[in-house]
Amino acid sequence: MAPTQIFVSPEFYGVYILQSEPSPRSFYIGSTPDPIRRLRQHNGDLKQGAFRTRRTSRRPWKMIAITHNFPSRVAALQFEHALQHPKTSRHMAGGGGSVTATAETAKSAPVAGKSDATSPAKNRRNAAPVARSGRTHLRNVARLLESPYFSRMGLKVTIFDPSLFDMDLLPAQLQSFAAFSGARTAACSDYFSVAKKAALTTAHCCLCSDAIDYVPEMLPESIKDVLLVLPLIAVCPSCAVICHLRCLAASWYQSSEINAALIPSDVSCSQCGAQTSWRLVADMATKLRQYALSS
């Protein structure tokens, strides 16, 4: 197995909302690992834009908000699809479909007394009214963040339009698009340096006391040969103690309530007691393994 086949959490992947400046009621939803480059593509500065943003009369487009910190590209694409199809998405919290203006819904509703024998395409249009305001889209984002599936991912929202910034509507960060960078913070870089040093100098798991090169026996030999270089290990950002990621998960599950979720939100260090985001620890584990395989 080549190192490129090993999963690594992306540095950045976001789902963005664009608004047309000449036509403020026109929006576009997409996903990207590079929002700055993607916006230039939508506005025609670079090639490979999108079919729906190609019309010169709708340009320029501006990015009004982006949801990020997804654990994988697949998770971002699922969020993008749900935001594009809020009326039919199973991830919409509350089960009531999307939040759309009453007037918009009324326009698309069938007229009383008319036959229901319409074409499938028309039925699809009637079932999914298009949101025509930035606040409506952000309400749908808020509902997705409350869903059981997305709520445990530790997603973040950055809003670039001050007129849409409302903490009561959606907990988010307000920032200018020019100042926004998809790169992780310097704190994450420092964490990687600490984790890398700990992984290279520590030989045993602090929870099970086994060697850090432990790999479950049920894995095929071909996979063992690769993973033995460095398995998924967790490093505490506070005290740099290390353990197997699976041992940390098992420890959390044993200390949790009977009806606890399968994936933790936060975990506690067995040595210093510091609370750490599970996403942060798990993402770092994939990066450490990639580092070992590429060294």
UniProtKB/Swiss-Prot annotation:
Zinc finger (SLX1-type): 205-272
GO cellular component terms listed in the entry, alphabetical order: Slx1-Slx4 complex
Localisation per UniProt entry: Nucleus
BP GO terms, sorted: DNA-templated DNA replication; double-strand break repair via homologous recombination
Domain GIY-YIG span(s) in chain numbering: 11-93
Keywords assigned: DNA damage, DNA recombination, DNA repair, Endonuclease, Hydrolase, Metal-binding, Nuclease, Nucleus, Zinc, Zinc-finger
InterPro entries, A to Z: GIY-YIG_endonuc, GIY-YIG_endonuc_sf, Slx1, SLX1_endonuclease, Znf_RING/FYVE/PHD
Record region (Disordered): 85-133
E.C. number(s) listed in UniProt: 3.1.-.-
GO molecular function annotations of the record: 5'-flap endonuclease activity; crossover junction DNA endonuclease activity; zinc ion binding
Co-factor(s): a divalent metal cation
Enzyme class: hydrolase
Pfam family of the protein (one): GIY-YIG
Membrane-spanning residues: none
Summary of the function given for this chain in its UniProt record: Catalytic subunit of the SLX1-SLX4 structure-specific endonuclease that resolves DNA secondary structures generated during DNA repair and recombination. Has endonuclease activity towards branched DNA substrates, introducing single-strand cuts in duplex DNA close to junctions with ss-DNA.
Subunit architecture: Forms a heterodimer with SLX4.
Family: Belongs to the SLX1 family.
The protein's name in its UniProt record: Structure-specific endonuclease subunit SLX1
Upper taxonomic lineage: Eukaryota, Fungi, Dikarya, Ascomycota, Saccharomycotina
